[in-house]
Each structure stands twice: as C-alpha cells, then as structure tokens.
Amino acid sequence: MTKTPDFTHATYKLVRCIGCDATVSVCRPQEGEYAQCPRCHHKLQSGSRWSLKRCSLIALSILILMPFALGYPLLSLDLLGTKIDASVWKGIWKMAVEGYSYTAFMIFICAVLMPVSFAILVIMLQISKLLKIKPRNVLLFVGYIKPWVMFDVYLVALAVTMFKVREYATLEVDVYLIAFIFTALLTTLLFIKINLDDLWHDFYPEQKPVTASDKPLELCTACDYTFLKEDQKYDHRHRAICPRCASLIETPDSIKLQRVWATLVAGIIMLFPANLLPISGVYLTGNLSQDTLMSGVMSFISMGSYFVAFVVFFASIFVPVSKILIMLYLLASVHFKWQHSIKWQMRLLHIVHFVGRWSMLDLFVLALMMSLVTRGQIINFTVGPAAFYFGAAVFLTMISTSQFDSRLIWKVYDRKQ
C-alpha cells in the first residue's frame, strides 16, 4: 500500500523552474520523494540523496582504484607468442607520441582528467564541510564537469575492442579489468547519488525563502537558485550576479542563441571530414587497410558481430547526426516561432542531453587498439585523420546542447497561448 505524504506542516517556498520558467510553490521533499514542475515535469527538488560523507568515501575508493584502472593492463593480446598489453594510459600516451596529440588530449580529458577531478572535488566538499568553508567554486565545478565523466562509455569501448581484435590474435583479460569495472560502477553510482541542489542548500542555507511575493523573482541557472530581484548583487562592472554563487544572471536570448549556433555550425563542419576520411588503419603483413566510420560498421557485420555493429553505428554515426538534426529543428522552432508539441520538443532535448556523450565511444576504441600493438610488428593499428575531426565534432555538439536554454522553447509556446 502506498503511503500518502503528509504536507500539513510542510513549509512551502516559491521557485522558478529552470526547465520552463514557471513559478511553482514547493515544499522540502522527504526521503524517497521528489517535487517536479507541473508544466514541464522537470525535477525541482529531490529527497533521494546520500550523505556527503558517504559520497566522499565512494570518491576516495575511486581515487584508490584509479591507478590500477588507468595505468595497469586491462587486456592482453597474444600475437605469435608475444604478449602485448592495453591500458587506458598506454593508449593515450601512444596516440600522443605518434603525432595525434590533439585527439589524445580529448580522450585524456574524458577518460582521465574529468573522472579524477570529479572524485577529488567531492572529497574537497567533505573537507570544506569539516572546516566550515563555503566551497562556491567547487560546487560550480562539480556541476560543470559531470557530463564529461565518461568511465561508463570507456567500459563499453573495452567490450567493442574485444570483438574488434579477436580476428587478429588471441585476446586475454587481465585481472586489473576488475578494478576498472569497479571504478566505472562507483563513478556512475556517485554520479547518480550526489545531489547538488541539496549540497547548495547545506552550504548556503536560505535566510529568507521566497514564500509569497508580488515582487519579481530571478533565477540563477548556474546553481538553480530562486531569489527576489531586489536581492541580486552586482560585480565590479555593475553586472547582475547571483547572491549565492556569484554567476552572471542576465544573458540576452540573442547571445544564448549565438553561442548555440556557433558551436553547432562548427560541429557540423567537423562532422563532414569525420565521416569521409579514414578514422583508423590496420597494417597487416605490410598491407594497409583503412576504415571510415561506416566501413568500420560494415566490417563488424561481415564478422557476424551484429550487436557490436549496432552499438558502433548508434554511437558513432546515428547519435552525432541525429543530435545535429534535433538541435537544428529546435533552433528553427525558436527562430521561426513554430508551435509544435511542446512535450515532444522537450523530450527531444532530453534525449540529446542523454545520448550525446556516447559518441566518444569510437575514440576510446581507437586508443585501446593502438596500445595493443606497437609499430614494427606484423600487425599495427593507426589512427586516421578523421579521429580529430570526429572528437572535435562530439565536443562542439555537446557544448552546443549544454548552451541551449529550454526556456526559449517555452517562451514561443507561451506567446501562442
């Protein structure tokens, strides 16, 4: 039997929804409950959280496992009696020293820098709590880097690599793969359980919650804080800033759209060479065989690995192209004031945010493939010129979607009502 929550003695406050800009009266949810916007169904507050102490212990466990997950062999290739190891760091380093430093740096950001930084920042939050420090910048950085933590994507890349190299030699799994799997699972768990809204509330409790007011309200999108317009502060250039996180508040819609268009168009330009040029090459007994994104999918199909072919096609071709098409449609809806189904438009935007990061799968596979075989042996993997353009396209489209403000769609919807 479902227990009905008791809101008799609850304290309500007004918040502006970051999804549709509606003003909603909400109370602090209890454990297992959450408050959502009645218009766009965006989650406004959640009572499901783990304590910061528990999250910091998970983060500490991640840092302890990181050297084993990143620096030690995960896979081994037995090629004519010679054992060749593949690790995360070895793949990135080999890619960098062989002239693909920009591509290696993009992989380093997503596979090493961001996961390590994420765990360190969570520990810094716990230290700040013990020392009674206000960690404004730490909280902001945690929110910024969460979409770029891609350990789960790298885990899938390992599985794809296993299928890809088994046609060339015998593949063995090393014991350190267990450390990598646990690190990926713990990172994903920490990603889900850490609640930034509650952390902001814990470190910066509201002195005067907005309960009822005819005065205009402001919303800071950086820390999701609703406050009275008269309480906003100003920086040295007399620009309005949030009284809690000191981020800029007022950004004109035209500037927001320019940022989205600039990064999206740049991503589209990068996607053409990414699909037309070879992304990888294999030297086998002196003969070079190069693959584009699509021919790589076809090679998996010819091997009979239909599921792997589907995964690679979905992550490397379908997701980037569909993400661009969806963003073009949403931008056109804002510019030309198209009033289509608002629920459908918001669902498309949520899908774009969710699947965008999985496009890095192909680059992670390339890094692992390069670390398995070194130059001068019978078989050798190389990175093609398309790898950089593909990585740049993924980065630019992810930035584009993060810059798109869903409230612009709702403004068009509200004008038509």
Placement of each model-derived feature along the sequence:
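Long C-terminal interaction/binding lobes of large macromolecular proteins
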Residues: 1-417
